[in-house]
Regions:
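Central hydrophobic cores of alpha-helical transmembrane segments in multi-pass inner-membrane proteins
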Residues: 11-15, 31-48, 60-75, 113-130, ...
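Transmembrane helix-loop-helix hairpins at membrane boundaries of multipass inner-membrane proteins
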Residues: 2-29, 45-166
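Functional transmembrane alpha-helices
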Residues: 37, 106, 183-201, 271-318, ...
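Transmembrane helix-loop junctions and nearby membrane-interface residues
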Residues: 45, 49-52, 71-81, 121-131, ...
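Interfacial loop-to-helix junctions that mark the boundaries of transmembrane helices
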Residues: 21-29, 101-109, 185, 249-255, ...
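Alpha-helical multi-pass transmembrane bundles of energy-transducing inner-membrane proteins
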Residues: 50-55, 80-83, 138-142, 163-257, ...
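Hydrophobic alpha-helical transmembrane segments of polytopic
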Residues: 7-8, 30-36, 40, 55-62, ...
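Juxtamembrane/interfacial segments at transmembrane-helix boundaries in multi-pass membrane proteins
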Residues: 78-100, 135-137, 207, 211-213, ...
Length: 535
């Protein structure tokens, strides 16, 4: 019944989208993918706050339809050409020059759009039981004289529930726009616009008292870094007379100016990755964010910086990218080793996964500037799957036991065997076991890096070994042991059907990408080759 009401509420939006086409079915689909999440958010805003079941249905239905449409783009996509496809123009949104705003898809952006749609749908499914009677599904519990407040995803009031879904759908819209817009200035606007819904997700629905501080750190760190990019965009415009991506790819910028512009872009993108030493905001943001916030942060937002390097820094500023490549190698290796060693001394599960993300993104930046861009992009996608799944698993533990500290766990396999099995699969992915997706990406990066610089390749391989160490250590501390460390752990049930279904797509992707990576590499091979070897 609620799904029927949701469909009825979305009918005007779907009717409008059906009349946006310009003759090309791919362009029509791309327009729908861009606008449908935003229209779903608008529908939610005008619904009464008490209609919480309808809110959930509209949000999930909107996200699922967007995902299905993105699959149609994959089917229609021609992976043999590096050119942008399904180019669509919004003539009603005119820039000062009178040129319509253009959006398009290549092999790089297509897979990131698919990943975004998958993760948003999973986030909405994770929060499906939130908001009942104004509380989280994990309501206040008293066990062994210890009272704990159930926060779950932090959705505590009916108004907050609606705002939560609106924030996720707006975030999805902005992320898709970042990956498809064909203008540098608009890329910056959407790039920064992502901060707003993510700030609210962390600051309002975070799980602890320091969530406001974490939200401020996330917002200010990334905003300050992006100011350099704004100055660089102004310099590019005065140099080339345009911010259109096709014009930039054909422009010749002097070597001295390339060095300045590259550094400005670097600070902005490095904060988002994040690279050492600009990573301090990430562990704090992950620890305080709700599960859905951590999933989106690790799965997609960390990819924005690497995407910026691949989309703009390398093709537009090739000389500077080559000039500063050794510096990036050093910073990447430092990130891999430092973050991996930091994982071994953490006792908070979220911090372990957060520092693990810093290490894996170190492999990504190493590959981007170490002649392994395809491996770097593949690892970006894989990390989006594995890290998101690990944060979901940590969130499922937290919803039951109200703690993320390793010292309180042990013997979980006795009471949660299904969870322990799934957690084991993603632990294998995190330590880059063969036949999992991370192994393919990291092996490609290490192979090309070693051929480029043997010292960096060897040190990075050491980080891969450390990754296996902290992953096995974490899993052993949580799952095995003679009995649970805290008595009340034994009172909680294993995963329910909804929780299992939310992880099922990620399990499928983990092994599909690991066993048959060519299905994904074929999609972006031509595009990556074009970006890294501009004519």
């Amino acid at each position: 019944m609620h799904m029927l009401k949701a469909g009825a509420a979305l009918t005007p939006a779907l009717y409008l989208l059906s009349h946006l086409g310009v003759g090309n079915p791919g362009s029509s689909i791309l327009q729908a993918i861009l606008l449908l999440p935003l229209m779903g958010a608008v529908c939610l805003i005008f619904l009464p706050s008490s209609a919480q079941d309808t809110h959930k249905s509209i949000a999930l239905l909107t996200s699922l339809i967007t995902f299905v449409l993105s699959l149609f783009l994959w089917v229609l996509f021609d992976h043999h050409t590096p050119e942008f496809q399904f180019v669509t123009e919004f003539h009603t949104l005119m820039r000062t020059s009178g040129t319509p705003i253009s959006f398009g898809v290549d092999g790089v952006s297509l897979l990131l759009i698919l990943l975004t749609c998958v993760l948003v749908s999973i986030c909405l499914l994770l929060g499906w039981d939130q908001g009942a009677m104004g509380e989280s599904v994990s309501r206040d519990t008293k066990v062994s004289g210890l009272q704990t407040r159930g926060t779950g995803s932090g959705v505590t009031t009916l108004n907050n529930l609606k705002a939560y879904y609106v924030s996720l759908l707006v975030l999805q819209t902005l992320l898709i726009a970042v990956f498809t817009v064909l203008d540098l200035l608009l890329f910056y606007i959407f790039f920064e616009g992502v901060l707003v819904p993510m700030y609210f997700i962390i600051g309002i629905w975070g799980s602890r008292e320091r969530k406001i501080t974490a939200a401020y750190m996330f917002f200010l760190y990334t905003l300050f870094g992006s100011l350099f990019m704004l100055l660089a965009i102004l310099m590019v415009y005065f140099q080339t007379g345009s911010t259109d991506i096709h014009t930039l790819y054909l422009s010749e910028i002097s070597k001295s100016r390339q060095l300045i512009l590259w550094l400005a872009f670097f600070f902005s993108f490095a904060v988002k990755v994040p690279m050492i030493p600009l990573h301090l905001w990430l562990p704090e943001a992950h620890v305080e964010a709700p599960t859905s916030g951590s999933v989106m942060l690790a799965g997609i937002l960390l990819k924005l910086g690497a995407y910026g390097f691949l989309r703009y820094s390398i093709p537009v500023l090739p000389y500077a990218s080559s000039y500063f490549a050794p510096m990036v190698w050093v910073l990447s290796v430092l990130a891999i080793l430092y973050a991996s060693l930091s994982c071994l001394r953490q006792i908070d599960l979220k911090k372990i996964v957060a520092y693990s993300s810093v290490a894996h993104m170190g492999f990504v930046t190493l590959g981007l500037f170490g002649n392994a861009p395809e491996g770097a992009l593949f690892l970006m996608l894989s990390h989006g799957v594995v890290s998101s799944a690990l944060f979901v698993c940590v969130g499922q533990l937290y919803e039951r036991h109200k703690t993320r500290l390793l010292t309180y766990y042990g013997g979980i396999v006795q009471v949660m065997p299904v969870f322990s099995s799934i957690f084991f699969l993603f632990t294998l992915g995190n330590l880059s076991m063969p036949c999992t997706s991370n192994f393919v990406g990291e092996f490609m990066v290490l192979l090309h890096t070693y051929n480029t610089n043997k010292v960096c390749g060897t040190l990075a391989a050491t980080g891969m070994v450390l990754g296996g160490g902290y992953s096995i250590w974490m899993y052993n501390r949580v799952v095995f042991g003679t009995r649970p460390k805290v008595e009340f752990i034994s009172h909680f049930a294993d995963l329910d059907r909804r929780e299992f279904c939310s992880l099922l797509p990620l399990i499928f992707l983990l092994f599909w990408m690991g066993i048959y990576p060519q299905a994904f590499i074929n999609v972006f091979h031509a595009s990556v080759a074009h970006l890294c070897m501009p004519s």
